[in-house]
Structures are given as structure tokens and as C-alpha cells.
């Protein structure tokens, strides 16, 4: 028996196996995926309320700077569904943020008039009560990301994101002013206090707004298995001008991505 005719067959099989292995290697990482993240968000909210005296509004605003420029933070989950093209990735994500709410009360007393002879005086008492809430109800985004393959494990990435956001915010601010006159009757006696005129100004506002905003994403992916990747990322998102409110977030996240 002559084994020579089997050599081309063995050579063909080897080439076919090598080509299949190479193709499998090239296709590694491609396909649909899901990702779950836990994000820490720094939120900056700027409100353009009327100034203390604004003739165009025809009223007095009692909103203090405390509620005009809010800096807060939250921790929230985020889920994504996307497709990996072997370099480029496209994903849709959804997130809900924690509701921010706070209140502030302040009181001040200013002496308006004092009689130097008998010590009688008139004071003005000003009370401010402010209650504010802000809630980024939801964010539905679409991002395009490019992965830089440094080696078989580490893949830094950078990309852009566009998102449709829903925001609710409200403010309830009341300023109450009371003038009080104190009459002294002499040493060892109880003075008489006469409440004077009261004035009260209020500013109330509540909005529910939806707007499309733009942002950027960056991070690094670490392959744990051929299908499982640990993702550490950062994203910046400017939600746009929401009527009289500007809102932007900086987020750091840690999550896992699974490719099917």
C-alpha cells in the first residue's frame, strides 16, 4: 500500500483548520451584549430664577442662591443593551437618578429706629422658608464607542452619547416680614411689644421637562473570560437648558458586560 496520496488530504485538512481558527479569532468579541453598571453621579443644577427685583416679572423673587446653584450626588443603577462589531460598539442604556430635596429656614432681625431718650425701638423681622426638589426621573441614551485593543485583556475606549432625559423640579419660597415696636416703661418693668404691619411674598414653580442632550464616555474594559468583561467607565452628560434650568452630570461607574 502506498500512503503518498494521503499527504494532500492531510495538508488540506491542516489549512482548513488553520483558516477556521483564524476566522474564529477574528470574530472574537463580536455579537450582541448586555451590561449592568452601578454609577456614582455628581450632579450640578443651575436655576435661572428672577432676581430679587425683576421688573420684567412684575414681582419679587425670594429664591436664594442656595437653590439657584445646587451641587449634589447620587448612586444609581444603569442597564445597557448593545452590539459589538469587533472594535466599534453601539449601545442603548437606561438609568434613573435619586430625587434631591432640601429645605432652608432663616430669620433675621434688623433695627430700624431707636429713640435715644427713652430707648423705644422698631425692629424688622424677616423670615425665609424655602423648599426645593429636583429629580432626574430617567435618561434613555444611545452611545457609539470605539475600543482600543492594547492586548488580549485591556481595552480602553472612548465614545459619544446622545440621550433623552426627563427632569422634574419645583421650588416653594416664602418671605415674611414683620415690623415690631418695643416700648420701654422704665427699669424693672416689662416692655410692651406692638406687632406692626406684615408683608409676605411667595414664589412657587413646578416643571416637568423632557429634552435631548449630548455627552461623552470613556473607560477601560478588562476581559475576564472571552464573553465576560469588567468595565470601569466615566461619562459626562449635558442635559441642555430645561426652560430656566441647566443640568449636567459627571458619572463614574463600575459594571460587567456579557457578550452572547
Swiss-Prot record:
What are the TM regions of this chain, as residue ranges? none
The residue range of the signal peptide is 1-23
Cellular component aspect of the GO annotation: cell outer membrane
Specify one Pfam family: Opacity
The primary location reported for this protein is: membrane
GO molecular function terms attached to this record: porin activity
Q: Where does the record place it?
A: Cell outer membrane
UniProt keywords (A-Z) are:
Cell outer membrane, Membrane, Signal, Transmembrane, Transmembrane beta strand
**Keyword Membrane attributed:** yes
Q: Which InterPro entries match?
A: OMP/PagP_b-brl, Opacity, Porin_opacity
User: What exactly does this protein do?
Assistant: Implicated in a number of adherence functions. OPA proteins are implicated in pathogenesis and are subject to phase variation.
The entry's family comment says: Belongs to the opacity porin family.
Can you name this protein? Opacity protein opA58
* Organism whose genome encodes this protein: Neisseria gonorrhoeae
- Name of the coding gene: opaJ
